Amino acid sequence: AICTQDSYLFSIAFLACAAANKHIILPGNYQPCALAELSEQFDCLLVDDSIGEVEVSDVRNIQTLLDTETREPRTDNLPPVDLAEIHLTLFTSGSSGTPKAINKTLEHLDIETAQLDKNWGDLLKGNRVHSTVSHQHIYGLLFRILWPLCSGVPFARSNLEYPEQILSHANKNCVLISSPALLKRLKNEINTAQLAGVFSSGGPLPTESAHQSRNLLGHLPIEVFGSTETGGIAFRQQESAQTPWQLFDCIEASLNSENCIKLLSPYIDNNNWYQTADECEMVSENQFILKGRTDRVIKIEEKRVSLVEVEKRLEQLPWISECVVIPFEEPERLILASVLVLSEEGQAKFATMSKGKFWLMLRSELRKWLEPIAIPRKYRIVDEIPLNSQGKRLTSHIEQLIKS
């Protein structure tokens, strides 16, 4: 297994493991206890100085290995590896809360890297890559490590973690690999900087944040829609919330009876269709509008409620910039609860009325669209939705906000 925050040391370890025909394990979490919990998945853990002490039988520091290596470096070419035989395991959030292992081969990643270069090779050429996302996950692995390596493009070994760092490093030769988690935090910045290009993936990017990124960084972000299981599916630059997604040209798609998209993709399996839980509307053979996840449907008092629809109805109100809706167990019943980020108009409205009247106003508006059972009964107002560095919602943090 490889777990580092240093992308240079990660690249050395990754290529060495591939050359040695090893099965590569990429934990998605840097925390020592989480790494120890995955120890049955690997024989040896390769780390850098950023990783704390881990209770694993064989832990090796990559920099120490490099510093103490006494053999002469090889100058001849290494023998080619069979990419289809080099296996890789990544981890994604499982519905049970336990990390879910996703298996791929380097051949899958090689095909996807070639597709990225086909689409945007000219954007990368002659520039350098900065990133705000981890290489331990598939988006960062592809966009900040493998694609630059295969294209001979330099990349930063450390993450940019704050909006001001993005702006201080930004120039016309910088391509930024980012996520909604950080791009949304640019809203309070006033300085501008011209980048060569911006990519975003890992979660939905609000239209307001996409336009703010264009104002500050010179480009609408290229959003990439996909998952650990599927790899990239489609991309867009969001002029409006209804801007359709464009399939990568090596992928075929169709809808099942529930209007969920299924894929025939070389990133997964060339011969078998892969069914997703993403509800879509096909607007052409290779473009679609994303409606939401059908697996975010719950039952409350025997009625099916789509959490995605409730969020959509809240966010179409002029007072709400962004929200998340979750089921919440009260002693006697299951209800919906929502964490809200107010728009400027919403903040002004909230300041002129009591909290109770504001909630009543929201509920009154939602009744135009939703059954009473689907209207959230608890609300919390925050400055931003809790997200991890990949742009995924931090459910435990959201639950704590509701309980507080």
Predicted regions and their residues:
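Conserved AMP-binding A3 loop
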Residues: 85-114
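AMP-binding/adenylate-forming
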Residues: 41-50, 103-119, 124-185, 222
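Conserved AMP-binding/adenylate-forming
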Residues: 1-30, 127-135, 304
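Gly/Ser/Thr-rich phosphate-binding loop
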Residues: 187-241
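AMP-binding/adenylate-forming core of the ANL superfamily
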Residues: 252-275, 279-281, 287
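AMP-binding/adenylate-forming catalytic core of the ANL superfamily
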Residues: 279-374
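Conserved pre-ATP/AMP-binding loop-to-beta segment of ANL
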Residues: 72-91, 122-129
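AMP-binding/adenylate-forming catalytic domain of the ANL superfamily
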Residues: 368-390
